[in-house]
Amino acid sequence: MAKAARRTKSAPARRSPRRHARQTGATIRRPKRPIKSNETIALPKWLGFLSHPLLKQMAKRLLLILVIVGFLAGLWAARWPQLLATKTGEYLGRQGFSVRHVEIVGLHHMDRQAIYDIASTQQNLAMPLVDLNAIRDRLLRFGWIEDARVSRRWPDTLVVDIVERNPAAVWQYHGHLRLVDNNGIIISDVDPHASPDLPLVIGAGANLHLEDLGHLLEAAPSLKPMIDAASWIGNRRWDLHFASGETLSLPEGNEAEAALVRFSHINREHHLLERGYVKFDMRVPGAPITARISPEPVKKATKPAKAADPLVSDRI
């Protein structure tokens, strides 16, 4: 009896899934096996023709053609705004909106014909097609022109507004005379026989120190009208050349201003200039002035001759 009870309490016998499926009518699905990397997937039979070598070659060519067509379409899409602008400009030009006049403003020293020659390259061109920046870039190549603005005045006029550089000095270097502005920028060459009434600066880099020279001369206003030229020596100090023929050698740096003021006071009391001296040496701050007397009477130099005066040489 106990044996039978134990038999009834035991777990039911495990049935096979396949047998259970046959009894219940269910369908058993096999688990999918993962595809290995070195295996290939077979195409369906109706797509088998794609594996033909000729079709593969045609597919490659078709892909190449599509890439080229796409590239050309991109180029066309990038150019069409420019083409549209060009066609619009040409249409406006046919309606009378083309360059027929050039107006120049702000020109005082430079030759006007040079400006006209540049602007005339746009003559009869449709106004919208005029390249204003190209005209401005060509104008800025001239030494006289510091800035330029080119604009359209409808219907048919180009306006060129010029800002000229102000000449500040004549720079002598290696025997050549050049007109420069206060920043040392070369404006134009200078005819030695028609030199303008401007200060003469001599030597390498002298054109780049005009502002410092101006401050130096302002310290001795009584001497400033008497000074004809200034030589920049060794890229560190000035020699001042007086119209009466003397040369004053100044020390370097900030000591130059004090030395020039001192010389101005001594000259006011003792009249050092136009007394036959050739050179005054004040290169040593605080030391007595060393003066050299000319063996011959000093001749006052004229403006064109000072560039060739051996006392005013740029070979330093």
Swiss-Prot record:
Disulfide pairings: none
GO biological process, one term: cell septum assembly
Pfam families: FtsQ_DivIB_C, POTRA_1
Transmembrane residue ranges: 62-80
Domain of life: Bacteria
PROSITE patterns: POTRA
Region (Disordered): 1-34, 295-316
POTRA domain mapped to chain residues: 97-165
Statement: the UniProt record of this protein carries the keyword Membrane: yes
Family under the similarity heading: Belongs to the FtsQ/DivIB family. FtsQ subfamily.
Protein name stated in the entry: Cell division protein FtsQ
Organism whose genome encodes this protein: Zymomonas mobilis subsp. mobilis (strain ATCC 31821 / ZM4 / CP4)
